[in-house]
From Swiss-Prot:
Region: Disordered, residue numbers: 344-368
The protein's name: Nicotinate-nucleotide--dimethylbenzimidazole phosphoribosyltransferase
InterPro entries recorded: Nict_dMeBzImd_PRibTrfase, Nict_dMeBzImd_PRibTrfase_bact, Nict_dMeBzImd_PRibTrfase_N, Nict_dMeBzImd_PRibTrfase_sf
Catalytic site positions: E314 (proton acceptor)
Pathway this chain belongs to: Nucleoside biosynthesis; alpha-ribazole biosynthesis; alpha-ribazole from 5,6-dimethylbenzimidazole: step 1/2
Family of the protein in this entry: Belongs to the CobT family.
Length: 368
């Protein structure tokens, strides 16, 4: 099996000197130092990603939804039939899904990548039709997992080369929270009963079936945690693997990524294994009620921007947070400095960088 180093170049840090300069610059603006709290943190993070203070406006946000079906859905782990995946993909293509509305409101555009939906189709983004039931068989073959990785890399390169300045991966696929929970449990050593939630709204019996499927999947890779490509091949799916490669390649290309809920964050965990340090380029858009989500966020060292109780997927929570990220950048660009506005500083004010954005939100590595 190919090692990740053969697929992904080294991930660099966002510019640490620019991060320090951005924090210092925040303290010159017409406000008490640190008073905008996490908005300051996010603005500084984007400045560090772009390598300049103030940062450039985020004019080309792009949402890419990775769609695929899952063999494990036949185990009764979802409240909806697998046919809904293809129907929802068509709704997105028609512009009528929640993610389309959220994207339009936030000034973003949406691309739907059909990686492994369960229908007869061909195309450069297709890996296979659905995937194996991960509790008893591999999700895909060795050739297919490499194909999924290469597709994710190619999609990231296409979007960045076309001018995208911030990326949001989204998910679509009935049953996809099952491989997501299995990945999160595997990489964080959390127990199946801890990472399994209600997904699309399953009842108690459905939850028990889902726990069993996740338990069995995790058992199959119990000695393979240090081999992320093999783990992906065995217990993820083509769409999750392509998404992970997309996220990892965005980090390689120095492009920030806003993460959505449990499925996307599971892919982000895998991305950070494939391209160590990729997490330095992540923003956690929101917190999902899925119990695996905060576990994955903690493992990545991320604090979500909003908590609206959203559990739709599609990239919807990240899209809801996108206006905050754009506003954080606009504040740095459009606010006056105290000198320009003729505003007196507070007596004895400490205007050093340390008195700026609240500690712990943008870490020194930096991670939001």
């Amino acid at each position: 099996m190919m090692v990740p180093a053969e697929l992904f170049a080294r991930v660099e840090f966002p510019d640490q000197q620019v991060l320090a300069d951005a924090r210092e610059y925040q303290n010159t603006l017409v406000k008490p130092a640190g008073s905008l709290s996490r908005l300051e943190d996010v603005g500084c993070f984007i400045a560090a990603c772009q390598g300049q203070v103030p940062p450039r406006r985020l004019d080309r946000p792009r949402i890419v939804v990775f769609a695929g079906d899952h063999g494990v859905a036949a185990r009764g782990v979802s409240a909806y039939p697998a046919s809904v995946s293809l129907q929802m993909a068509q709704s997105m293509l028609d512009g009528g899904a929640a993610i389309n509305v959220l994207a339009r409101a936030a000034g973003a555009s949406v691309r739907v990548a059909d990686i492994s939906l369960d229908h007869e189709a061909t195309g450069p983004e297709r890996v296979r039709r659905s995937c194996g039931s991960i509790d008893i068989e591999d999700a895909m073959t060795g050739e297919e997992v490499l194909q999924a990785l290469q597709i994710g890399i190619r999609i990231a390169d296409q979007e960045i080369d076309s001018g995208a300045d911030i990326l949001i991966p989204g998910d679509l696929g009935i049953g996809n929270t099952t491989p997501a929970a299995a990945l999160i449990g595997t990489f964080t050593l959390a127990e199946p009963v801890v990472v399994v939630g209600r997904g699309t709204g399953i009842d108690d019996e459905g939850w028990k079936r889902k726990v069993t499927a996740v338990r069995d999947a995790m058992f199959r890779v119990r000695t393979l945690r240090q081999d992320p490509i093999t783990v992906a091949r065995m217990i993820s799916s083509p769409d999750l693997t392509a998404m992970a490669a997309f996220i990892a390649q965005a980090a390689v290309r120095r492009t920030p990524v806003i993460l959505d809920g449990a499925v996307v964050t599971a892919a982000a965990l895998l991305a950070n294994k494939l391209a160590p340090g990729a997490r330095r380029w992540f923003i956690a858009g929101h917190r999902s009620p899925e119990p695996a989500h905060p576990i994955a966020l903690d493992a990545l060292g991320l604090t979500p921007l909003v908590d609206l109780g959203m559990r739709l997927g599609e990239g919807s929570g990240a899209a809801a947070a996108l206006p905050l990220v754009k506003t954080a950048v606009d504040l740095m660009i459009d606010m006056s400095t105290m000198n320009d506005a003729g505003v007196d500083r507070a007596d004895g004010a400490d205007n050093s960088a340390d008195s700026g954005a609240s500690a712990g939100t943008v870490a020194s590595d930096p991670t939001v």
